[in-house]
A protein has these predicted regions:
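Positively charged n-region of N-terminal signal peptides that target proteins for export
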Residues: 1-4
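Bacterial N-terminal signal peptides
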Residues: 9-16
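Ankyrin repeat arrays, specifically the small/polar loop and inter-repeat linker segments at the C-terminal end
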Residues: 20-45, 57-58, 65-75, 91, ...
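Ankyrin repeat A-helix N-terminal signature
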Residues: 50-55, 83-89, 116-122, 149-155, ...
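Acidic (E/D-rich), amphipathic helical modules within compact regulatory domains
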Residues: 108-111, 115-116
Length: 245
């Protein structure tokens, strides 16, 4: 009788231990990793980013419980923040920032996430990223490229958001052009007027020595020319000389 009781107790203990092994402890990263392994879920950046793409925050939480580094990029160079920002997925973007993700990162093309967001033109996303960048202590001077992109693509609303965040509106790009030059070169009236109303220098020269009005004249934009002249813009002697040649 005693042997039977001992056997039953041993069987019960074995069953209990087996049950413990199958139970995941969300507070134990190793336990969560064992669970993922058992479920044949790869504990990789590619997998985590795919969850971000599909807005699966439950699975993302599982990875974070297993001590996944939230900013890791997938094989294509995009991390979860880059993907969420590009797709305009505010739910996932907020989730990521609330769980410690950084905004001051690059995407798979080597562009800063804020620059890509400005190019996409999603105001809500841009505002959220700017808030996060401020929390991270990123200087507003680092937003110069985003301003150039907004001016180049004629996104006056993006210029306004960036200006409100303290971004420099007169930073010269590597090509020698300022935002006002790009706005005019590409015929972006609203972007140009926003910059003028913000008090930028309308007679600043580009790296080639041409003024803003020179570019408006060269490209043939009557509406822009009229507004620039009203704001006090002038042509340069160099432009008249070169245009005759």
């Amino acid at each position: 009788m005693n042997k039977k009781i001992l056997a039953l107790c041993a069987a019960g203990l074995l069953f209990s231990m087996t049950g413990c092994e199958e139970t995941m402890d969300p507070n134990d990263p190793q336990s969560v990793r064992r669970y993922l392994t058992k479920k044949q879920i790869g504990f990789t950046p590619n997998q985590f980013v795919s969850y971000a793409v599909n807005s699966d925050t439950a699975k993302m939480t599982l990875f974070l419980q297993a001590s996944f580094e939230i900013d890791q990029p997938a094989d294509n160079g995009n991390n979860a923040v880059a993907i969420a920002a590009n797709k305009g997925n505010m739910m996932v973007l907020n989730y990521l920032f609330d769980h410690g993700a950084k905004a001051n990162v690059q995407n798979g093309s080597g562009d800063m996430v804020i620059d890509n967001a400005v190019s996409m033109g999603n105001k809500e996303v841009v505002v959220r990223i700017l808030e996060q960048l401020k929390k991270e202590g990123v200087a507003s001077q680092n937003l110069a490229t985003a301003v150039l992109l907004a001016a180049k693509t004629g996104k006056a609303d993006m210029l306004e958001v960036l200006a409100d965040a303290g971004a420099p509106l007169e930073a010269r790009g590597p090509d020698g052009y300022l935002p006002i030059h790009w706005a005019v070169k590409n015929g972006n009236f609203d972007a140009m007027m926003f910059l003028i109303n913000k008090g930028v220098d309308v007679n600043v020269k580009c790296g080639q020595g041409y003024s803003v009005l020179d570019w408006a004249t060269n490209e043939g934009y009557p509406r822009l020319i009229k507004a620039l002249k009203k704001a006090g813009a002038k042509n340069t002697k160099q432009y008249f000389k070169d245009s005759k040649g």
